[in-house]
Amino acid sequence: MHTRTAPRVRPPSRAAKLAGLLYSLLSYLFFLMTLLYLIGFVGNVGVPKTIDSGPGASWPLALLVDVLLITLFAVQHSVMARKSFKQWWRPVVPAPIERATYVLASSVVLVVMFWLWQPIDLRVWQVESRLGSAVLTTLFWLGWGLILVATFLISHFELFGVKQALDALRPAKPVDGSFRTPLLYKIVRHPMYMGFLMAFWATPEMTVGHLVFALTSTIYILIGTQLEEKDLVEIFGEKYRNYQKNVGMLLPSLRRNPGSQD
């Protein structure tokens, strides 16, 4: 009687690991360019096409297209982050470049949104006061700054897929999987999402097109945060439940219970 043994899987060669690192770095650079364009796109500054510029369709068609574009990003961003999807594509996408591929896919969808976005140039509000305009513009830039700082407080290069590819090339230090709340995370549970909300809503001149973008993005952030927190409770259990009780989700909470995280 003959039995078949499963073929031995060869570990990736150093050349393959270097290729993975190069891929991850290129994905990261593409993400940075996309993020910079997103800032200009939302802020109507420094890029050829913004949220309020360019030719647009009739407003019902423009509204439909814009909502579909945000929905496309929301579906891609959420589905690819699910554990079940990661298990499904793991045989195809090696673990060291899994996160970089996710980041690349998200960047590509954003580029599609920039390209196909339909402006709806009807004013919802326009702040005439210099002081009011300056305050809103400052909040806009503070929002992007908050996002950047928040990424480095956790692990910037791991979040965007570079660290995983680098760790495949060299012995990685043991990962501290304990629950931590560094700096901003002691004030609000999701400072990155808070930053996005600030950046999307703080504008001296709100058009209907910008409002559609801000409103649909806010709905997605609220839904996505709930999904993310479900995963975090599954990972950290009671520690994260206590964190939820003591710290606001997207806005700082005035209430602080004795059992809060250090």
From Swiss-Prot:
It comes from the Bacteria. It catalyses: methanethiol + S-adenosyl-L-methionine = dimethyl sulfide + S-adenosyl-L-homocysteine + H(+). One of its GO terms (molecular function) is methyltransferase activity. Disruption phenotype: Cells lacking this gene are unable to produce dimethylsulphide (DMS). One of its GO terms (cellular component) is membrane. Its EC number is 2.1.1.334. NCBIfam families: MeththiolMtaseMddA (NF045656). This is Methanethiol S-methyltransferase. It comes from Pseudomonas deceptionensis.
